[in-house]
Amino acid sequence: MRKLIGILFFLFLFSFYLSVAFAHEAYVLNNEQFTQGLKEFSANPLAPLFDPSKIQISIIITAIVVLVYLVNVLFSTTKNAAFLDKKIKKISVIGPFLIRLAVGASLFIGAQSDALFAPELSISFLPFSETLEIIITITSIMIFLGIFTEVAAIFALCIFTLATFFYGQYMITYANYLGEIIVLILFGSRFLSIDSILFRKKLFISKLERFKHLEVPIVRILYGIALIYAAYSIKFLHQSIPMMVYDEYSLKQVFNASAEYISAGAGLTELTIGLFIFVGFAQRLTVTIMLIFLTLSLIYFKELVWPHLILFGIAISLIINSGDKLTLDYYFIPWIRKRIQILKSIAKK
């Protein structure tokens, strides 16, 4: 019984540990702290993970992750998994719809708060800010309602481009927005939208219909890029920023580990999850894990909800529309299934 309690307690701490990976430091720290952190660079951010005093914990965590993913891969080869996949994909249209609502709501709420895509990106910093705020508000309403969605998305792309000109490569952190904007420009939104009444299912450019299968991959790949870049640029390149979060929220009381170790582990976790989403490996499991710990982070650090709407929207969409033709899962799972069948046939002989 004591061992069981010990294991459960360890898993609880492990879950909380992973939630730190999805704490968005720009929402948790004040602007002065975040700006100061960007000026400080880390020499060897992964070194704490190989500290002899913590190597055992690192090995245990790695073993747990490998085991969970191994079980997931094996389950994915079963008939039950295939049956569940078909059931889930029957509501595939819900995914893009949720993302559209999330983008529209995020842009609208952000505009009312002098924020573009995220709290740290001030609209006031951009030229013609008052006019821009009005344009963003109108664009957000058009996207949310799904009226002339392609046109609204073109405006959104222009706004994203303008922000990139002033905020530079930091905008890669919000490549998830770019992915959805591109998809809306190409394919619009014909589900529960005003456009569906005006144009039915017809696209503005009908020839783009043949590329509709790229809708999910575009969103997924750019979402993965956003996570990978956030992990690298903040938790690795500027490790003092997550360390500030560690100190600010007294996380030492929760973890028996240094701020450097937790920051490095959180960074590696976010990087791995971003990479798995990018290549489409164990997509449903990976996105579900991300969704759970994103929620835990949101609750514990009391972050603003609206910047996370698009993250939740994309996550739910990727869970529903998992295993597209440009994912590793699409090829890897059938290959594993065949290998298992071969082994079973050999065993029978």
Per-segment meaning from a language model:
Residues 1-24:
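N-terminal secretory/membrane targeting signals
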Residues 6, 21-135, 145-241, 257-268, ...:
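Extended, low-polarity transmembrane helix blocks
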Residues 140-144, 274:
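Short tryptophan-centered beta-strand motifs in secreted/extracellular beta-sheet-rich domains
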Residues 241-248:
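Short Gly/aromatic-enriched secondary-structure transition segments
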Residues 248-256, 260:
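Extracytosolic (periplasmic/ER-lumenal) interhelical loops and adjacent juxtamembrane/interface segments
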